[in-house]
């Protein structure tokens, strides 16, 4: 096993559903201006599938970008603030 790490490919998978600040304002008492002025956020993605499913798609895209097969990967790291479950980790679901 190598003693260093390389980023040899990357992939992403974003849910198609978008919730704008105006959409948010129709549900709670807020406005686009209020949200943007305090957070800089104008829209967010909304997923109806587990994050591990999105991560798996992104992982396959990263492998294709790098020209690698899954068995050639020594380590999988997943970072998220919205895990599918506390235990096991999202990385375990993706693996």
Task: Locate predicted features.
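Conserved "HGTGT" condensation-loop signature of ketosynthase/thiolase-family condensing enzymes
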Residues: 1-77, 95
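Active-site-proximal gating segment of KS-fold condensing enzymes and close homologs
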Residues: 77-95
């Amino acid at each position: 096993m190598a003693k260093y790490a390389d980023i040899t490919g990357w992939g992403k998978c974003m849910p198609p559903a978008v919730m704008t600040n105006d959409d948010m304002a129709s549900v709670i008492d807020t406005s686009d201006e209020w949200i943007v002025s305090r957070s800089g956020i104008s829209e967010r993605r909304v997923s109806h599938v587990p994050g591990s499913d999105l991560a798996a798609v992104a992982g396959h895209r990263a492998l294709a970008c790098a020209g690698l097969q899954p068995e050639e990967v020594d380590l999988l790291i997943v970072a998220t603030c919205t895990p599918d479950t506390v235990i096991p980790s999202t990385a375990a679901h993706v693996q």
